[in-house]
């Protein structure tokens, strides 16, 4: 992404890209309060959403967060969602220097340093920060990304330099998206009073009021009079807002996708029950002694590769923010010509430090799955029911009743979520959803290689832990046995031959078998269960009507899916959990539209219908 070109004038940051100050050079703090952060009233509601065009140095955000935390809880929302779009990246040290030169540093030190600790690299994406009672989604993209987003803001901060120097931030296309992402009575806050901005706001249904600006300036405020109606050509992928009878959630399965989801739900005040068929945690694929956090490396502009990268970096940031984990990196090796070609095309990618046939991923590293899952469940305060093998559910009076083996029944859940990994194949029977259950075996060896970070090629090697070194993993679609196979251990050892001397004697001390869940297109399957009969009837003519407005989708009660994470569940589970929470709790969707379409449970059916099949 583009990096901001800035200098200091009178200790105030000045943009060379826009030939303008980032804010009022004389009294920027008070102007920001007057125009933006103190110009609206909080609402005592579940979620309050502020959207901003132009994050800049983050001053509006920190002022808003301070105001939130200083307000009596009964007079403010329970959770603030702050979504800010920024196209010009400012380096971490530059941000700290700006606050120091402005003499704001001490006032914002605690919040600023928390922010800088998890500040991402200069790469496009949506990055979430966890603050007390607040989620910040920092969107590193051009402002045109708004057309890819889905939320309904309570307040908009239209910031971004003088309109005559940054027309795109105030033009008709932007204001249309602002209106689309607003609801009735959404307030627009802006320092500008430009006539063309007023004209664009009025065109899309805003009531515009001129008011006294900061000091002698004039500014406007605007309020959306009625929510905008627009034609949705892809309504089959659009969200349906949920209505819950209570805040009880049942999750089937106790692996990593369940653990991250339970934690995220707990931040929203849900009561969570988790049902696991085994007698303890760690019996499935999420229970290995060691594993690696890494990313696929595909060619640029490949959706699967870009999604893998975003999943990886957000998982790394999540584990660091929530569990205080530290990562030393992971080395990926190109072990064939195709992989080398991919590596060669990614040399400019800031996530991958590529040298010859090696890529060093600084944000990756070794993970300890059993401990990680256990810690997340403990933080979530979820109640885990072991030895509960799920069989079926009934949905009546807006609640689920669950039936388990041995005639065990649990009831009164407003939401049910399938997160049972490879076992999902036995419970989901959509015609077009093809699921695979793939066996994987890791091998436990006596320590043989001293490495501070994992090495990944045909197979991977983890650093030593507790006098044990894990390598793996096999890949078998045909074998469903839980018993370890000697030939799989042999294959795992053969696949790490490039890392060891041929005379090295390896001692096998154990192995573990798990099963991965895969979709036919390698994307995870996450979202609301859909009404297959409705989809087949309503969208049967998509071959001829795909460019026309579509009828809103019909979903199947409050049943949600969270599976098909393949071998990278410790990466993808974080974005999956956030997205599901957004659907369940009517929050801003934290993914761009292209990714929502890629993981939607109905995507396989829609592809077929578009072909007229």
UniProtKB/Swiss-Prot annotation:
Localisation per UniProt entry: Cytoplasm
Reactions catalysed according to its record: 5-aminomethyl-2-thiouridine(34) in tRNA + S-adenosyl-L-methionine = 5-methylaminomethyl-2-thiouridine(34) in tRNA + S-adenosyl-L-homocysteine + H(+)
Gene Ontology CC: cytoplasm
Region (tRNA (mnm(5)s(2)U34)-methyltransferase): 1-225
Residue numbers spanned by region FAD-dependent cmnm(5)s(2)U34 oxidoreductase: 252-613
Enzyme Commission numbers on file: 2.1.1.61, 1.5.-.-
GO aspect biological process, one term: tRNA processing
Cofactors (names): FAD
Presence of the UniProt keyword tRNA processing in the record: yes
GO MF term list: oxidoreductase activity, acting on the CH-NH group of donors; tRNA (5-methylaminomethyl-2-thiouridylate)(34)-methyltransferase activity
Record keywords, A-Z: Cytoplasm, FAD, Flavoprotein, Methyltransferase, Multifunctional enzyme, Oxidoreductase, S-adenosyl-L-methionine, Transferase, tRNA processing
Function comment: Catalyzes the last two steps in the biosynthesis of 5-methylaminomethyl-2-thiouridine (mnm(5)s(2)U) at the wobble position (U34) in tRNA. Catalyzes the FAD-dependent demodification of cmnm(5)s(2)U34 to nm(5)s(2)U34, followed by the transfer of a methyl group from S-adenosyl-L-methionine to nm(5)s(2)U34, to form mnm(5)s(2)U34.
Family to which this protein belongs: In the N-terminal section; belongs to the methyltransferase superfamily. tRNA (mnm(5)s(2)U34)-methyltransferase family. In the C-terminal section; belongs to the DAO family.
UniProt protein name: tRNA 5-methylaminomethyl-2-thiouridine biosynthesis bifunctional protein MnmC
Species classification: Bacteria, Pseudomonadati, Campylobacterota, Epsilonproteobacteria, Campylobacterales
């Amino acid at each position: 992404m583009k990096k901001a070109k800035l200098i200091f004038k009178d200790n105030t940051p000045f943009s060379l890209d826009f030939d303008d100050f980032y804010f009022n050079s004389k009294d920027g703090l008070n102007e920001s309060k007057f125009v933006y952060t103190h110009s609206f009233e909080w609402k005592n509601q579940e979620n309050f959403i502020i959207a901003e065009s132009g994050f800049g140095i983050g001053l509006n955000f920190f002022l808003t967060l301070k105001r939130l935390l200083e307000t009596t809880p009964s007079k403010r929302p329970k959770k603030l969602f702050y979504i800010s779009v920024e196209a010009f990246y400012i380096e971490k040290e530059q941000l700290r220097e700006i606050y120091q030169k402005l003499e704001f540093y001490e006032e914002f030190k605690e919040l600023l340093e928390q922010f800088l600790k998890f500040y991402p690299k200069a790469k496009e994406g949506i990055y979430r920060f966890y603050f007390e009672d607040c989620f910040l989604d920092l969107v590193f993209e051009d402002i045109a990304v708004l057309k890819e987003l889905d939320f309904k803001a309570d307040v908009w901060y239209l910031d971004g330099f003088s309109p005559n120097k940054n027309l795109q931030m105030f033009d008709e296309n932007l204001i249309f998206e602002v209106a689309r992402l607003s609801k009735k009575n959404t307030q627009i806050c802006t320092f500008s009073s430009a006539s063309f901005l007023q004209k664009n706001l009025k065109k899309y249904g805003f009531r515009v009021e001129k008011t006294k600006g900061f000091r002698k300036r004039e500014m406007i405020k605007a309020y959306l009079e009625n929510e905008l109606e627009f034609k949705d050509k892809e309504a089959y992928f659009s969200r349906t807002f949920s209505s819950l009878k209570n805040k009880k959630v049942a999750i089937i399965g106790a692996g990593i996708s369940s653990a991250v989801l339970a934690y995220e739900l707990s931040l929203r005040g849900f009561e969570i029950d988790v049902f696991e068929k085994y007698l303890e945690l760690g019996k499935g694929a999420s229970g290995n002694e060691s594993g690696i956090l890494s990313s696929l490396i595909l060619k640029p502009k490949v959706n699967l590769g870009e999604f893998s990268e975003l999943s990886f970096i957000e998982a790394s940031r999540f584990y660091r923010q929530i569990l205080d984990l530290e990562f030393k990196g992971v080395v990926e090796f190109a072990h064939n010509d195709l992989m080398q070609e991919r590596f060669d095309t990614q040399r400019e990618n800031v996530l991958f430090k590529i040298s010859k046939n090696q890529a060093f991923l600084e944000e990756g590293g070794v993970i300890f799955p059993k401990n990680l899952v256990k810690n997340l469940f403990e933080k979530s305060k979820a109640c885990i029911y072991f030895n509960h093998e799920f069989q079926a559910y009934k949905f009546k009076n807006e609640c689920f009743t669950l039936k388990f083996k041995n005639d065990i029944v649990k009831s009164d859940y407003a939401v049910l979520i399938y997160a049972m990994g490879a076992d999902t194949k036995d419970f989901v029977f959509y015609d077009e959803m093809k699921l695979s259950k793939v066996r994987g075996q890791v091998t436990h060896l006596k320590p043989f290689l001293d490495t501070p970070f994992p090495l990944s090629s045909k197979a991977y090697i983890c650093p030593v832990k507790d006098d044990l070194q894990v390598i793996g993993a096999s890949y078998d679609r045909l074998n469903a046995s839980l018993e370890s196979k000697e030939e799989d251990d042999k294959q795992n050892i053969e696949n790490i031959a490039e890392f060891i001397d041929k005379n090295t004697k390896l001692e096998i001390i154990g192995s573990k078998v798990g099963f991965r869940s895969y979709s036919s297109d390698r994307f995870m399957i996450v979202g609301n269960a859909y009404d297959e009969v409705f989809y087949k009837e309503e969208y049967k003519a998509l071959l001829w009507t795909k460019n026309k407005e579509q009828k809103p989708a019909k979903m199947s009660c409050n049943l949600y899916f969270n599976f098909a994470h393949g071998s990278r569940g410790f990466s993808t589970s974080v974005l999956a959990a956030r997205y599901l929470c957004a659907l369940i709790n009517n929050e801003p969707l934290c993914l761009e539209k292209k990714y929502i379409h890629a993981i939607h449970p109905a995507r396989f059916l829609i592809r077929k219908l578009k072909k007229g099949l």
